[in-house]
A protein has these predicted regions:
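Non-cytosolic beta-sheet module surface loops
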Residues: 148-150, 286-289, 298
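Short strand-turn-strand beta-turns centered on an Asx-Gly dipeptide
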Residues: 159-167, 299-300
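Mature N-terminal, pre-catalytic/accessory segment of carbohydrate-active enzymes
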Residues: 248-260
Length: 300
């Protein structure tokens, strides 16, 4: 797993796989969560339940707004999303003399959408293929927001519905982006240099108790992100693409993946008898200058 890069979801810091992270900062609110490089995460807006938004269920799931976050670095990624009504289930059992009862469970019809990314040579292309299928209550007319993780502002932003380029307008704040509703043939773009992932208590419909909690003041600042919102369209009719020129998503603190031929092996490996207990064996060795960690292979 060493060549694989993993990205801390909450900070954007990148790590190489195949290692143990010691002294990892994980306060009470933070579940250690790492995203594999080139992963794609489709989602809906934040909600409290899977039921549709109504006057009495204001914090339900609004399926008319889809959000797709891309964690591209270099290379390609792909993810197929399956969506259904979230409630249909049918079990038709059959009997087999040798086996017994056989369950045949169906969750009804569904819609599938393939999302993909390709980043190479300073250009990244993100694609939402035309959705396939249907289910009861499905509406393919949706707005789409692409979120691309980056480490610098891209040089160019090109958004397309099918083969038609959209008129992309840049806004100057996250609030302006969130409030924008692009018209047909339009898209809205915002580069957020230091996004704050903590939205708790900031919604217009938040309760007074939620607004008054001290956690609201906690900043969860992550790496820069590019936000592009497409106008509402029939997502089953054509693919949607976003191309970023001058794309880069690299962590300057990420150690180079190369072997140091001049690094010496530790000497004087020992297990002092006076430090051995019934449940542990303490190992000691000589310090190696330039070493950042030591790996031990234990046989037995």
């Amino acid at each position: 797993d060493n060549p694989t890069i993993w990205i801390d979801y909450f900070s954007g810091k990148q790590y190489r796989g195949g290692q143990v992270l010691n002294n990892y900062d994980a306060p009470l609110w933070k579940l250690p969560l790492f995203v594999k490089a080139n992963s794609i995460v489709p989602m809906y807006a934040e909600n409290n339940n899977p039921e549709a938004v109504t006057e009495t269920n204001t914090k339900g799931t609004d399926r008319s707004q889809r959000i797709v976050e891309f964690f591209a670095t270099e290379g390609e990624g792909s993810f197929t999303q399956y969506e259904d009504d979230g409630s249909s289930i049918e079990n038709k059992t059959t009997e087999d003399n040798a086996y017994g009862t056989i369950d045949n469970i169906s969750y009804g019809d569904h819609v599938s959408t393939v999302f993909s990314s390709k980043a190479t040579g300073g250009t990244a292309t993100f694609t939402a293929a035309a959705s396939q299928g249907s289910y009861s209550g499905y509406d393919s007319n949706r707005t789409t927001t692409f979120v691309a993780n980056v480490s610098a502002k891209p040089a160019s932003v090109i958004a397309k519905n099918g083969g038609t380029a959209l008129n992309v307008t840049e806004v100057d704040s996250q609030e302006a982006f969130d409030a924008a509703t692009p018209e047909a043939g339009q898209a809205v773009y915002f580069y957020n240099e230091s996004p704050n992932l903590n939205h708790y208590g900031s919604d217009a419909d938040s309760t007074e108790a939620e607004k008054g909690e001290s956690f609201n003041d906690t900043k969860i600042t992550t790496n820069p992100k590019v936000y592009v919102k497409f106008a509402k369209t029939d997502v089953a009719a054509a693919e949607q693409t976003l191309e970023l020129g001058g794309f880069v998503n690299a962590d300057a603190t990420l150690a180079a993946d190369r072997l140091n031929e001049n690094l010496s092996a530790p000497a004087n490996l020992a297990a002092p008898e006076d430090a051995t207990t019934p449940t542990s064996i303490k190992l000691t060795w000589g310090k190696v200058d330039g070493a950042t960690s030591y790996d031990l292979k234990v046989d037995g």
